[in-house]
Protein backbone atom coordinates (compact mmCIF):
# COMPACT_ATOMS: atom_id res chain seq x y z
CA UNK A 1 0.00 0.00 0.00
CA UNK A 2 2.73 2.43 1.01
CA UNK A 3 4.74 1.74 -2.14
CA UNK A 4 1.70 2.48 -4.33
CA UNK A 5 1.13 5.75 -2.49
CA UNK A 6 4.80 6.71 -2.89
CA UNK A 7 4.87 5.83 -6.62
CA UNK A 8 1.44 7.06 -7.69
CA UNK A 9 0.21 9.33 -4.93
CA UNK A 10 -2.84 7.10 -4.43
CA UNK A 11 -3.87 3.98 -2.57
CA UNK A 12 -4.12 0.80 -4.69
CA UNK A 13 -7.95 0.84 -5.02
CA UNK A 14 -8.02 4.50 -6.08
CA UNK A 15 -5.10 3.99 -8.49
CA UNK A 16 -6.65 0.88 -10.06
CA UNK A 17 -10.03 2.61 -10.38
CA UNK A 18 -8.35 5.54 -12.14
CA UNK A 19 -6.75 3.08 -14.58
CA UNK A 20 -10.21 1.68 -15.38
CA UNK A 21 -9.57 -1.76 -13.93
CA UNK A 22 -12.84 -1.68 -12.03
CA UNK A 23 -14.87 -0.89 -15.15
CA UNK A 24 -15.15 -4.65 -15.65
CA UNK A 25 -16.46 -7.13 -13.07
CA UNK A 26 -13.78 -7.43 -10.39
CA UNK A 27 -13.19 -9.28 -7.15
CA UNK A 28 -10.46 -7.85 -4.93
CA UNK A 29 -8.84 -10.14 -2.37
CA UNK A 30 -7.99 -9.41 1.27
CA UNK A 31 -8.61 -5.62 1.40
CA UNK A 32 -7.28 -5.42 4.95
CA UNK A 33 -5.80 -1.91 4.81
CA UNK A 34 -8.60 0.10 3.16
CA UNK A 35 -9.27 3.77 3.77
CA UNK A 36 -12.76 5.26 3.79
CA UNK A 37 -12.07 6.56 0.27
CA UNK A 38 -10.99 3.07 -0.85
CA UNK A 39 -14.21 1.56 0.46
CA UNK A 40 -16.26 4.24 -1.30
CA UNK A 41 -14.48 3.58 -4.60
CA UNK A 42 -14.90 -0.19 -4.33
CA UNK A 43 -18.59 0.17 -3.48
CA UNK A 44 -19.23 2.71 -6.23
CA UNK A 45 -17.55 0.45 -8.81
CA UNK A 46 -19.38 -2.67 -7.59
CA UNK A 47 -16.14 -4.46 -6.73
CA UNK A 48 -16.62 -7.64 -4.70
CA UNK A 49 -14.18 -8.27 -1.86
CA UNK A 50 -13.03 -11.82 -1.10
CA UNK A 51 -12.10 -12.07 2.56
CA UNK A 52 -9.27 -14.56 3.19
CA UNK A 53 -9.12 -14.88 6.98
CA UNK A 54 -6.79 -17.91 7.24
CA UNK A 55 -4.29 -16.37 4.85
CA UNK A 56 -4.43 -13.00 6.61
CA UNK A 57 -3.92 -14.69 9.98
CA UNK A 58 -1.06 -16.90 8.77
CA UNK A 59 0.79 -13.95 7.22
CA UNK A 60 -0.04 -11.58 10.09
CA UNK A 61 -1.62 -9.20 7.58
CA UNK A 62 -4.40 -8.04 9.86
CA UNK A 63 -8.15 -8.44 10.03
CA UNK A 64 -10.39 -7.07 7.29
CA UNK A 65 -12.84 -4.46 8.56
CA UNK A 66 -15.99 -6.26 7.47
CA UNK A 67 -18.23 -3.87 9.40
CA UNK A 68 -16.86 -0.84 7.53
CA UNK A 69 -17.02 -2.62 4.16
CA UNK A 70 -20.63 -3.63 4.78
CA UNK A 71 -21.49 -0.08 5.83
CA UNK A 72 -19.93 1.21 2.59
CA UNK A 73 -22.11 -1.16 0.55
CA UNK A 74 -19.40 -3.59 -0.56
CA UNK A 75 -20.51 -7.15 -1.32
CA UNK A 76 -18.30 -9.62 0.54
CA UNK A 77 -17.28 -13.13 -0.47
CA UNK A 78 -15.02 -15.76 1.08
CA UNK A 79 -11.69 -17.00 -0.24
CA UNK A 80 -8.92 -19.32 0.87
CA UNK A 81 -6.04 -17.71 -1.09
CA UNK A 82 -3.16 -19.75 -2.49
CA UNK A 83 -0.96 -22.49 -1.08
CA UNK A 84 1.84 -20.07 -0.23
CA UNK A 85 -0.33 -18.36 2.35
CA UNK A 86 -2.92 -20.96 3.33
CA UNK A 87 -1.94 -24.61 3.41
CA UNK A 88 -5.49 -25.75 4.04
CA UNK A 89 -8.05 -24.86 1.39
CA UNK A 90 -10.96 -25.67 3.65
CA UNK A 91 -13.92 -23.34 3.18
CA UNK A 92 -15.47 -24.54 6.44
CA UNK A 93 -12.31 -23.50 8.29
CA UNK A 94 -12.17 -20.12 6.59
CA UNK A 95 -15.84 -19.49 7.30
CA UNK A 96 -15.24 -20.36 10.96
CA UNK A 97 -12.18 -18.10 11.12
CA UNK A 98 -14.04 -15.23 9.46
CA UNK A 99 -16.77 -15.48 12.09
CA UNK A 100 -14.37 -15.66 15.03
CA UNK A 101 -11.98 -12.97 13.81
CA UNK A 102 -14.81 -10.52 13.18
CA UNK A 103 -16.43 -11.20 16.53
CA UNK A 104 -13.09 -10.83 18.31
CA UNK A 105 -12.14 -7.71 16.36
CA UNK A 106 -15.51 -6.06 16.93
CA UNK A 107 -15.76 -7.36 20.52
CA UNK A 108 -19.30 -8.24 19.50
CA UNK A 109 -20.61 -11.83 19.56
CA UNK A 110 -23.26 -11.05 16.95
CA UNK A 111 -21.30 -8.85 14.53
CA UNK A 112 -22.01 -11.33 11.72
CA UNK A 113 -24.95 -13.72 11.91
CA UNK A 114 -24.56 -17.33 10.79
CA UNK A 115 -27.05 -16.69 8.00
CA UNK A 116 -25.07 -13.67 6.81
CA UNK A 117 -21.85 -15.69 6.86
CA UNK A 118 -23.45 -18.47 4.80
CA UNK A 119 -24.61 -15.85 2.28
CA UNK A 120 -21.05 -14.49 2.05
CA UNK A 121 -19.76 -17.99 1.28
CA UNK A 122 -22.52 -19.06 -1.12
CA UNK A 123 -24.78 -16.48 -2.74
CA UNK A 124 -22.21 -13.68 -2.79
CA UNK A 125 -19.51 -16.01 -4.06
CA UNK A 126 -21.74 -17.00 -6.96
CA UNK A 127 -22.63 -13.36 -7.70
CA UNK A 128 -18.96 -12.40 -7.74
CA UNK A 129 -18.51 -14.92 -10.56
CA UNK A 130 -21.50 -13.54 -12.46
CA UNK A 131 -23.50 -16.68 -11.65
CA UNK A 132 -26.97 -15.45 -10.73
CA UNK A 133 -28.45 -18.92 -11.23
CA UNK A 134 -26.80 -20.55 -8.22
CA UNK A 135 -25.67 -19.88 -4.67
CA UNK A 136 -29.13 -20.10 -3.17
CA UNK A 137 -32.00 -22.53 -2.60
CA UNK A 138 -34.79 -21.24 -4.80
CA UNK A 139 -37.10 -22.54 -7.49
CA UNK A 140 -35.36 -22.09 -10.83
CA UNK A 141 -31.87 -21.92 -9.34
CA UNK A 142 -29.28 -24.53 -10.29
CA UNK A 143 -29.16 -27.54 -8.01
CA UNK A 144 -25.61 -27.00 -6.73
CA UNK A 145 -25.63 -28.62 -3.30
CA UNK A 146 -23.36 -29.91 -0.57
CA UNK A 147 -24.87 -32.28 1.97
CA UNK A 148 -23.33 -32.95 5.37
CA UNK A 149 -23.54 -35.73 7.93
CA UNK A 150 -25.07 -34.01 10.96
CA UNK A 151 -25.01 -37.12 13.15
CA UNK A 152 -21.38 -36.65 14.20
CA UNK A 153 -20.66 -35.79 17.84
CA UNK A 154 -19.26 -32.32 16.98
CA UNK A 155 -22.45 -31.41 15.12
CA UNK A 156 -24.60 -32.08 18.20
CA UNK A 157 -26.80 -30.69 19.50
CA UNK A 158 -28.49 -29.14 16.51
CA UNK A 159 -30.28 -26.05 17.77
CA UNK A 160 -29.64 -23.90 14.73
CA UNK A 161 -28.31 -25.60 11.61
CA UNK A 162 -26.76 -22.38 10.33
CA UNK A 163 -24.75 -21.99 13.56
CA UNK A 164 -23.64 -25.63 13.38
CA UNK A 165 -22.51 -25.15 9.80
CA UNK A 166 -20.35 -22.16 10.78
CA UNK A 167 -18.96 -23.31 14.12
CA UNK A 168 -18.91 -27.12 13.96
CA UNK A 169 -18.89 -28.47 10.39
CA UNK A 170 -15.75 -29.95 8.89
CA UNK A 171 -14.81 -30.92 5.37
CA UNK A 172 -14.94 -34.57 6.42
CA UNK A 173 -18.67 -34.12 7.14
CA UNK A 174 -19.45 -33.76 3.42
CA UNK A 175 -21.38 -36.81 2.22
CA UNK A 176 -22.64 -35.53 -1.13
CA UNK A 177 -21.87 -32.82 -3.64
CA UNK A 178 -24.12 -32.01 -6.58
CA UNK A 179 -23.58 -29.61 -9.47
CA UNK A 180 -26.55 -28.65 -11.63
CA UNK A 181 -28.43 -31.69 -10.39
CA UNK A 182 -25.62 -34.17 -11.11
CA UNK A 183 -24.12 -35.95 -8.11
CA UNK A 184 -20.34 -35.67 -8.24
CA UNK A 185 -19.46 -37.18 -4.87
CA UNK A 186 -21.39 -39.51 -2.62
Give the location of each predicted region.
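Short beta->alpha connector loops
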Residues: 31-35, 55, 132
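Histidine/acidic residue-rich metal-binding segments in metalloenzymes
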Residues: 1-48, 60-76
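Short, acidic/turn-prone active-site loops that include or flank metal/cofactor-
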Residues: 53-57, 82-84
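His/Asp/Glu-enriched, well-ordered alpha-helical/loop segment
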Residues: 18-21, 25, 67-152, 160, ...
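Short, charged, surface-exposed secondary-structure boundary motifs
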Residues: 58-63, 87-89
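Short aromatic-centered micro-motifs
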Residues: 177
Amino acid sequence: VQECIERHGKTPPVYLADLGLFDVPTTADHCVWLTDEDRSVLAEKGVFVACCPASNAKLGSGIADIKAMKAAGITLTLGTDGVASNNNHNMFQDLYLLALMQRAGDANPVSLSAEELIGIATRNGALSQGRVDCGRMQVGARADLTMLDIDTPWMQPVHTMAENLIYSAQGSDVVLTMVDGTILYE
